[in-house]
Amino acid sequence: MLIRVEIGIDAALLRRAFESDAEAQLVHDLREDGLITLGLVATDDEGQVVGYVAFSPAIVQGEELQWVGMAPLAVDENYRGQGLARQLVYEGLDSLNEFGYAAVVTLGDPAFYGRLGFEQAAHYDLRCRWPGTESAFQVHRLADDALNGVNGLVEYHDHFNRF
């Protein structure tokens, strides 16, 4: 298994990693608009894409604070349960930390993301625009001071509003 930065030719192979075409279309739209801060793929021994994670800009209370949103994260069903999602997330967090980003937000299972160092964003008075997601909205600080004095609405790009 190899985890690497995505390249243009991977686009056609991504649909295999997603459960629905909506996620693949989201990635396509983000890429077309130059909004993927970092995209990583996991490939099998034959070079087929079997996992994917994207990070794109997120703003807090209308301000650019070097935060990114992590979505989508997907692993081909034949490769689930092998720690591939965890590896993709860790690789992304490491790279974003090296690039100087301050924090990463995501929506997902608190038990899974909690094991990866994410915390409920609500503990820091952070929220996203989608009602009923309070327990699923997570934040991971990359910079020690990323959450100092920061609170309010965290927004992903409008492309995410279709979900």
Residues covered by each model-derived region:
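Short amphipathic alpha-helix that is part of the acyltransferase structural core
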Residues: 1-27, 33-50, 63, 143-145, ...
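Short hydrophobic/aromatic beta-strand or adjacent loop that forms the aromatic wall/cage
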Residues: 37, 133-138
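Conserved beta-strand in the GNAT
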Residues: 39-41, 47-59, 66-74
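Conserved glycine-rich acetyl-CoA-binding loop
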Residues: 48, 63, 76-87, 99, ...
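Conserved acetyl-CoA-binding loop-helix of GNAT-fold acetyltransferases
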Residues: 70, 75, 81-94, 105-106
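Conserved active-site alpha-helix within GNAT-family acetyltransferase domains
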Residues: 98-102, 107-133
